[in-house]
């Protein structure tokens, strides 16, 4: 068992996938698996995944018929070996090397089942903070339209499975 399974749903992402995976490879936390779910891509995403798998033994690739990112994420949760899971879409990236380590430290320190961090939206060189994480306590995001930003969260895998999330 590893600490974190990073689940990457992949669909026709040959142009962005290498950058996304590189941002996972550079993480300071190395006790991770990178679980890529190829969701029926028709481009060269499979070639990028094969290359990544050869380059880094933490990469594990699964292939399925196209069923959508949600189904790919759920398959990733079911197949994951990590105590925690994180999601990273194939067109997103972790902005620095300490993202997973910081989230894991916060989750273990607090005992939280779900732990989140900051979000920045970038378009070219234009970067805007959308949510800034502080350590002052729990921030309720229920009233904010942030539900699509899976990459900012770390989830206790057992919590997701037990609650069928």
Task: Please report, for each region that a protein language model flagged, where it lies by residue.
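Nucleotide-sugar donor-binding/catalytic module of glycosyltransferases
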Residues: 1-165
């Amino acid at each position: 068992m590893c600490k974190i399974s990073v689940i990457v749903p992949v669909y026709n992402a040959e142009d962005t996938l290498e950058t996304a995976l590189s941002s996972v490879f550079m993480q300071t936390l190395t006790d991770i698996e990178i679980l890529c779910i190829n969701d029926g891509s028709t481009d060269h995403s499979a070639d990028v995944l094969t290359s990544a798998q050869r380059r880094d033994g933490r990469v594990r690739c699964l292939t399925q018929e196209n069923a959508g990112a949600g189904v790919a994420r759920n398959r990733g949760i079911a197949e994951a070996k990590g105590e925690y899971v994180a999601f990273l879409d194939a067109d997103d990236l972790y902005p620095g090397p300490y993202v997973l380590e910081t989230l894991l430290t916060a989750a273990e320190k607090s005992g939280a089942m779900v732990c989140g961090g900051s979000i920045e939206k970038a378009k070219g060189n234009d970067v805007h903070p959308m949510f800034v994480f502080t350590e002052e306590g729990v921030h309720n995001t229920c009233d904010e339209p942030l539900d699509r930003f899976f990459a900012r969260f770390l989830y206790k895998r057992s919590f997701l499975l037990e609650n069928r999330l």
